[in-house]
């Protein structure tokens, strides 16, 4: 029986194993550096409170991806706890499981995300509501309007992410809502970032699109938007994203696949234009800031190799056989790391002034983009609104994730957990979101290489891609495996395309690398 060695137990690696088992006779072996399933899409747990590291909506325009999700965890057939408490109506799947009776169920949730700027809330994406103009004030509103009109007439050549945003929103709105947040996220100014990230993350969204959607809603209340960034509902596993990936891992093992933890790929062996093996070193606390190599090594050999490890690490682990130019480009590929603080509080200072009903009338947001320039926090997750089953006590506490973007080794990364938690709390107090005396508990998690970055040597990445594609039995998948800011569904699609190539006996990797770049993956989902 042929074997496939898969580096990484995140969405891409798991999907590769799952598809191989369902559609081929190839035996998959997954080697995972950490002790967790799901990669950055895992669900962390602290004293019964569950954390989604970054916020992961389950929505895809690809029906095969949607079918896999539903196959693993079917849609709810009865109301969730908070919907029952509030009398809210949600679409239900006929014959679907009851989330009050079973855990293996996917909920349908309402997407609410807003921007916190000037100590006020703005819809994200920016909407045409009167509140938007009131909060912006007359002068800012006029500047934004004229700036957008100017951007419609005078188009900039898109050499940077700054150009991309200005062309779609105008300079005043870009300065208000994109410039500072983007610099927080990447650590460099948008003028120094390639426009690719905007094309992949914002895609077809622009102020013109927002206006068009507003007018369609105005004259046709039943109109459904087709822009991914505007989708109003999404699927979400009852206990967070990691629950689904853990279910997939369980199914993989039931079908005969193998998963090994604490295995850090430290050497990729090559021979005659093929990958011939992966040497792993046993680690403790794999993937964390406290990671330690034990020295115990194991070499895994197979017929096919799937890599979801960071491209930089993959190339450097290939040794001196890599061309110098490719080595140098890969070595300097930038990425951003991530810190999240799980914060449990009695209540929030910010009030729910919307018409949306919530438990204890907390703000309805799943996540909030913090645009205030006097703090370093980037995003705030409110896990109660993702799923009422994420907090241990949804009825009387608010469980949040305070998200910071950083670089391994910088001042934030090197802070002790205790100091960082104090710092994060002080920032929420500063911008009037919580009172310090309302804090009940907190935890602190670091995540390495969460965001592949689009500056530095990224401009020459095609040379690295070409080199890696020259190995017929190597398939690079997922966010880190392709150095591309993919969503979960895109990561899954790279795995699906790779398995399709193997089934077809093809060594052409074009379709795999084109996921989330070609128009076919941006097509509107048909009704």
Language-model features: where?
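Mid-domain catalytic core of redox enzymes
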Residues: 23, 237, 261-419, 423-432, ...
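Conserved flavin/dinucleotide-binding core of flavoenzymes
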Residues: 43, 126, 361-366, 374-527
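Short, well-ordered coil/turn residues at beta-beta hairpins
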Residues: 61, 167-168, 308-309
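Dinucleotide-binding Rossmann-like beta1-alpha1 core, especially the glycine-rich loop
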Residues: 47-152
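Conserved Rossmann-like nucleotide-cofactor binding loop
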Residues: 12, 36, 312
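Glycine-rich FAD pyrophosphate-binding loop
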Residues: 21-46
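Active-site/ligand-binding neighborhood in enzyme catalytic cores
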Residues: 130-132, 136-271, 276, 282-289
């Amino acid at each position: 029986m042929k074997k496939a060695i898969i580096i990484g137990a995140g969405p891409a690696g798991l999907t590769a194993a799952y598809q191989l088992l369902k559609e081929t006779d190839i035996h998959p072996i997954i080697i995972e550096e950490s002790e967790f399933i799901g990669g950055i899409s895992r669900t962390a747990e602290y004293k019964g409170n569950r954390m989604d590291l970054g916020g992961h909506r389950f929505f895809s325009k690809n029906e095969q991806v949607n079918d896999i999700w539903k196959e693993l965890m079917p849609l709810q057939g009865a109301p969730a706890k908070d919907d029952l408490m509030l009398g809210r109506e949600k679409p239900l799947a006929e014959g679907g499981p009851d989330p009050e009776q079973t855990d293996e169920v996917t909920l349908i949730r309402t997407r609410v995300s807003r921007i916190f700027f000037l100590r006020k809330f703005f819809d994200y994406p920016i909407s045409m509501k009167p509140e938007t103009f009131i909060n912006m004030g007359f002068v800012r509103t006029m500047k934004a309007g004229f700036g957008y009109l100017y951007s419609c007439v005078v188009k900039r050549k898109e050499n940077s992410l700054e150009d991309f945003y200005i062309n779609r929103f105008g300079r005043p709105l870009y300065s208000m809502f994109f410039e500072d947040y983007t610099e927080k996220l990447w650590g460099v100014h948008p003028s120094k970032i390639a426009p690719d990230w905007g094309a992949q993350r914002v895609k077809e969204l622009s102020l013109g699109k927002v206006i068009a959607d507003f007018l369609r809603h105005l004259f046709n209340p039943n109109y459904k938007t087709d822009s991914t960034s505007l989708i109003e509902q999404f699927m979400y596993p009852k206990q967070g994203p990691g629950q689904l990936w853990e279910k997939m891992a369980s199914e993989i093992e039931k079908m005969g696949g193998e998963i090994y933890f604490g295995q850090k790929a430290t050497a990729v062996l090559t021979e005659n234009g093929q990958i011939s093996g992966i040497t792993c070193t046993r680690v403790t606390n794999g993937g964390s800031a406290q990671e330690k190599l034990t020295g115990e090594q194991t070499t895994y050999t197979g017929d096919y190799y799937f890599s979801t490890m960071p491209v930089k690490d993959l190339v450097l682990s290939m040794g001196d056989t890599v061309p110098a130019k490719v080595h140098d480009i890969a070595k300097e590929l930038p990425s951003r790391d991530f810190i999240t603080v799980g914060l449990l509080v009695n209540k929030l200072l910010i009030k729910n002034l919307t018409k949306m009903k919530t438990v204890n009338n907390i703000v309805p947001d799943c996540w909030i983009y913090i645009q205030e320039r006097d703090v370093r926090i980037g995003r705030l997750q409110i896990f109660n609104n993702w799923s009422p089953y994420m907090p241990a006590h949804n009825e009387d506490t608010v469980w949040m994730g305070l998200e910071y973007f950083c670089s391994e080794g910088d001042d934030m990364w090197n802070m002790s957990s205790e100091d960082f938690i104090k710092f994060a709390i002080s920032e929420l107090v500063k911008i009037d979101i919580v009172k310090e005396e309302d804090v009940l508990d907190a935890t602190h998690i670091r995540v390495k290489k969460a965001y592949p970055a689009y500056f530095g040597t990224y401009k020459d990445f095609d040379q690295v891609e070409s080199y890696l594609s020259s190995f017929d039995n190597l398939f690079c998948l997922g966010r880190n495996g392709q150095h591309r800011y993919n969503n979960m569904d895109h990561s899954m699609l790279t795995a699906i395309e790779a398995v399709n190539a193997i089934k077809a006996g093809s060594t052409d990797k074009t379709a795999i690398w084109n996921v989330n770049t070609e128009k076919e993956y941006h097509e509107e989902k048909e009704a």
